[in-house]
């Protein structure tokens, strides 16, 4: 853990334990630097991280303070849904959304994507330019069906942060997370099969189901704990569900991070009814926590979770680099791909 992260964790714990109360002034940057023997820039990074987490707020010429307690509006109630599979019908709304011509002066709230104008991407663009200059004819050839061995090794290393112990041989490279999700669905389902989904859910995932001829069974989902396990179990008892599709970390659109105990309970439910879990972890690295939240895949000991991810939300969507860890479905995934 880097110095600024350690410092942020230490001070954040003091705030959460009540040692600093709402409205209290936090130690100055210089005082923290002297107390912990670190540079001023390290302290500033730590305070910026605490600010991002809502634990500190800067005041001009006054330093950092613990934010005053805010009255949060009530969370929306879980909708009462008809527990039956339905055909997906969102073509017109989705087409209107994706057909919108991006304007450089308008924040694209309809699309989850990083700011590609950020100076932090300059090292990436320089690296891409250098690779293009030195590329030879091999760069124009097909990779193996699994994808680049070097890239798969790096993805496997990255997955360690989410608690997932995978090797390069477990990873399959895809053209973005959307392809990973589509291939996962095709690997475990046939046209007309039923897939349990969170409600509300990401429109792109729903369009994948529709395009592949699947039926969606909406499961009520709340913005704190995620998909209702009680409603899901009832649905599993009533319908021949082939897969459960979820985004447990930094969910789109609700934003929740599913508690770890509920991730384990969801996996146990899938094991009891012998269904696959298709896990979309494309937003998982955006969590304001260290370490980042674990994936359901990290608890999977029988290979029923197909983990999907990409760099689209943390680096740049134009890279079109995604991956999946398909577990027991690896052969079918490679066949579908």
Could you say what each language-model-derived stretch is?
Residues 133-273, 284-302:
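Conserved core of the PLP fold type I
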Residues 241-243, 275-276, 306, 321:
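Short, Asp-centered acidic motifs that coordinate Mg2+ and/or phosphate
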Residues 67, 110, 220, 297, ...:
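Residue-level detector of conserved, well-ordered beta-strand and adjacent loop positions
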Residues 112-116, 178, 202, 249-251, ...:
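Short, solvent-exposed loop/turn segments at secondary-structure junctions
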Residues 280:
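Glycine-centered flexible beta-alpha turn that most often forms the glycine-rich phosphate-binding loop
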Residues 1-130, 333-337:
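N-terminal basic, amphipathic alpha-helical segments
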Residues 121, 151-152, 330:
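A general structural signal for well-ordered alpha-helical segments in protein cores
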Residues 301-337:
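Conserved core segment of the aminotransferase class I/II
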